[in-house]
Amino acid sequence: MDRRRIRYRIEYGVFQIFLFVMRCLPVRTANQMADGVAWILFHLIPRRMTRYQVARENLQRAFGNSLNDWQIDETIHGMWRHLFRMIVEIVHLPRRLRLYNCLDILDFTGRDDCVKAMCSGRPVLFLGGHFGNWEVSVNTFGHFGFPMSVVARALDNPWLHQWFRQFRESTGNRLIDKDGASSELMRIMERGGMASLLCDQDAGRSGLFVDFFGKPASTFKSIGLLALQYNALIVVGGAWRLPDAEQAGARWNRFNLTTEDVIDPADYQGVNGLTELTQRFTTSLENLIRRAPEQYFWVHRRWKTEPNTRRKARAA
């Protein structure tokens, strides 16, 4: 057995122990543990190991002078609290979120617009980002009888990947490997199906540059092209955790499942239609993130690729 397989087995064993411990703990205690780990990571772990500078630069790029140093640090600390709470929520999700108790756990914003899109008979692309708890979103749609195909990168550890596959498909959703997803997405669109994917990943030099928080960000063209080719509606949304002040008396964490925007590609048939469509869903995601900035993954290098004009100016 090679070292990699040994490491994978150890990782999976540790993960199973973590699952057992988290399932045994009350919700409040599990949240407190998540907050404690976030405090240690933010205050005690060397910042070069936690990509602190990347998060800080991203926040400064997104919000400019509207955030002072203290507010930036509070947002980064809040981001880590959110991420560790999300891990705990994923462990609890299969037993805590059921169809009969959805209204106790979820508030809905824009629900009617989302339902109309799903019942339109047209293919639908659900777009989200590294924001809130995206697992709650797709899990909820499965419970309500609207299963969809979820595009995600395969995990390196095959045992962990299988666990997450079973978790994501437990409510009827289907997992699609990000590598080679294009052909499968086209088949889904041809059948009038629904698919969910992230739209805030850097697309490299071949991407389409549109503004994200007022700064040009390379964005995949494929989303807009799919929508335009197959007349697919685009629904931008996500599930974000409600503030602690609104959690009082709840048996589990509560979320707002928000439909931020529903976009019809028929409105973008002009010469610049692809750019305008891509800009609209990117702006919609930005508006969603502004609802709870601390629940966005700011260590994600969204602005990694610079436009050609900026690269040429730097080289001159």
Where are these regions (language model features)?
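Short, flexible loop segments at the rims of nucleotide/cofactor-binding pockets, characterized by
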Residues: Y100-I105, R153, S170-I176, F213-G214, ...
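Catalytic core of membrane glycerolipid acyltransferases/transacylases, capturing the structured
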Residues: L93, S120-D179, R205-L208, F212
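Membrane-anchoring hydrophobic helices of lipid-metabolizing enzymes
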Residues: M1-G128, G172
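Non-catalytic C-terminal accessory region of glycerolipid acyltransferases
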Residues: D2-I6, R28, N65-D69, H77, ...
